[in-house]
Amino acid sequence: MSKLDELLRELCPNGVEYKKLGEIATVLRGASPRPIKKYITNDSDGVNWIKIGDVPVGSKYITQSEEKITKEGAEKSRYVRKGDFILSNSMSFGRPYILAIDGCIHDGWLSISNFKDVFLSDYLYYLLSSSAIQQEMKKRASFGGAVQNLNADIVKALVLPVPPIEVQSEIVRILDNFTKLTAELTAELAARKTQYSFYREKLLDKTEMKALMVEIADLGKWSGGKTPSMAEKKYWESGTIPWVSSKDVKQPILSDTIDHITNAAVDEASMTVYPAGSVAIVTRSGILRHTFPVTYIPFETTVNQDIKILVTKEGISSRYVSHALQAYGESIRRTTKKQGGTVDSLDFQKVLAYKIPVPPLDVQNRVVNVLDNFEKICSDLNIGLPAEIEARQKQYEYYRDKLLSFKEHKNELSD
């Protein structure tokens, strides 16, 4: 018998009590001082202004904020403390994060606090991340088939298992071991990707390739996109035509889009369908605060207004351009990013004027062959480290959901 089995048998032989989260914790919605620009400050005594863009990909903790607000702004916002939980009520819907800093949250967040007499922080994190709770939040927040913003009442109504602290601690120990293994593999993969970036930059060195420096504008035809009316169901329901938005551009090669539109949208909303083999970049999104997203699209697609898409001209390999834009991406982002504005964006005219090395087509193809093979090793979920990480993650999710499922203890009323 495992230690967990022993603890369950000893401490809760008749099952585990379930309680509504609102009965054992404080759940509140964030608040935004408006207009927010008035309260943003660079002063050292400013209060952390926590946004979704401050969250590292895959992170459990929020450790810093890019912006601060004045104390006056903080009085009009929701103050949260180190150790509290926050949940996104829109982007990264329902995803829990543990605060490692004090600060303020806007109305796109919910906070959970005053739970430590009942829950270990790490146990509550695993519990809120579990498939059952995530599905329950999505179900409760859905109305008429459209996902609504997650609100405090929905989160308060979540019914959660409350085992003894000793049981929570053992579950955390087991799941921490799973996540530690995954983290080690992920770190090794990150090191390989760093190595890949180094070799990519060496291969794309203009001197090594005897390449000409060519303005991005001269690589082919650049175009933008738009969004068909969301109010027209016929533009979206059962759509089969890919529609690229910034949330799709996360991998070097796009496998599919989250949203799809219909032929009616193409015809009536004058959407342009771009050919397979196009290259897309994001020019307007919060992700531009730290990343320049580029992707190669191996299928016909449409795009929204935050995307610019390139159809390369004869003599230019679109795969080569994709690799080159990724290699020079940080420099492009830094030199073309607009200052100010409510949403991060690039000055596209400056992007078009940026120069990248373009060698003869046969050299482009040789470079692509080398980089495609290296990229496959780094990102293909069917081989090597990516496959092992994927398998570990599935194993972790399986045991997490299994360990967090308890027989419910129901108090019997005596006659």
Question: Predicted regions: what is each one?
Answer:
Residues M1-L11, K402, S414-D415:
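Accessory (non-catalytic) regions of SAM-dependent nucleic-acid methyltransferases
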Residues K51-I52, Q64-S129, S245, T262, ...:
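A short beta-sheet element
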Residues L8-S32, K202, K206-T227, E388, ...:
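Non-catalytic DNA-recognition/assembly elements of restriction-modification systems
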